[in-house]
Amino acid sequence: MDFESHIEKIRDKRHWWTTVDTERYSWNDIMHLVDTHPNDEYDWNRDKQRLGMNSFHRRPSAPQFAKDIFKDMEDFFVSRAPAKSHSEYEKGPPQITNIAFCGFGKYTGSYPRHKDSMDVFLVQVIGDTPIRIGYTEKRTENDEDRIMKPGDAVWIPRNTWHQLTPVASRVTFSFGFESDSDCDPSTFI
């Protein structure tokens, strides 16, 4: 993923859209990923009919595009992040985390409108999922509403309000740049 070409929006803390070649990833592929994922890295939410697979990029069965995004984010963000001594970190050293969200059925849920303390790169892999992105806690006419389709991806800067409202089975990959608040990419990229 070419994060360099979006550097101004990253510095301005604005969300931006792109596409990712998801290699026509199928439900059979995702079920193989589910079946080969370690149980201790499952995050099953029964109320939301959703399975999360933490650190899924490490699986041999993970798609190459996900492994590439993880590496590209490490190279672009983690390698450029200001260094501190280990004892100075509140959350620990900057890192890339990821989770594959698999929602099953038309009542699959997500989180209510929220903001994350990390920067998020979200990739829609299977199914269509409505998303709303805004810059205030309450919904306004300035919010952006879209339906994410397979291959759609969006950069959501930390502290940006957003909400996915799934309406059918779906797979969404989430990659996060996690760091202390004083290590916001807008300040060092």
Could you describe each region identified by the protein language model?
Residues 1-38:
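An N-terminal JmjN-like helical accessory module and its immediate linker preceding a catalytic domain
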Residues 5-8, 35-152, 160-189:
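Active-site region of the double-stranded beta-helix
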